Amino acid sequence: MKKTFCIVSFVFINSLFAYSQTTISTKDIYEFPVRQGTKEWLQFETIEKRIAALQIPDTVLIKISTEGLLETCLEFPYLTDIFFCDNFQHSFEALMDEFNGFRELFKRRDLTNVLLEKYKCLTVDVKGIRLLKDVEQGMFTFRYFVLEFMLTQDAVLNNLTEEQEKQLFFLSFEHKKIKQNYSDIFGSLNDLPINLLYVKKIMNDSDFKFENAETKKMLSDFIQAPLVIDQRIIDLIENKYINAKYK
């Protein structure tokens, strides 16, 4: 996947790495051999060669913990590629294709537990967000978005136990409150993963009755290309179905 990076993305990812290193306690995070802002980074003739150098060696990949692998993926230098397309699902699938860390992560049997635990920890981490500088707040909400988007992937949702499903939706209620309380920091884009989660849930429930075929198609299209959806529809789904089922 060909890419052109602007200075903003360059600064953002460098800062993202610095921020994550100060907030993560996982010991076996893979340290990428090249980083933006270094001579080595600029010496690569093509982006493809640079991405090849960023792959995790097989000897490391089989030993790294799922927690460490998740944090490594969240530090992948080209993680912002998820925003370089108007279809976030396609962008995420492209990240899976280009980085072996993501591919390995989604093979792990304990991925769901690790994602849920990380998601739970974010409810605590966010309490200090107002103490961060604007750029750091942006980094935090970006990682927040990516983590929530991972939780909406079919590989996760289709393998949830009943207890994990309850936990996920309970946490989603907590995170919706957080975003409302910090609406000056979280943009509307941060609502997308939870919206997608709710839509996927009702689309897979044969008992849910749609108002009309047009609404069903709109929701189906949103799953295929998650970007924008009428918030009134989401509110209706949440109030009449999600809340009744999980609260």
Question: What residues fall within each predicted segment?
Answer:
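Sec-dependent N-terminal signal peptides
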Residues: T4-I13
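C-terminal segment of classical bacterial N-terminal signal peptides
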Residues: N14-Y19
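Non-catalytic all-alpha helical scaffold/repeat segments
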Residues: Q21, D28-K247
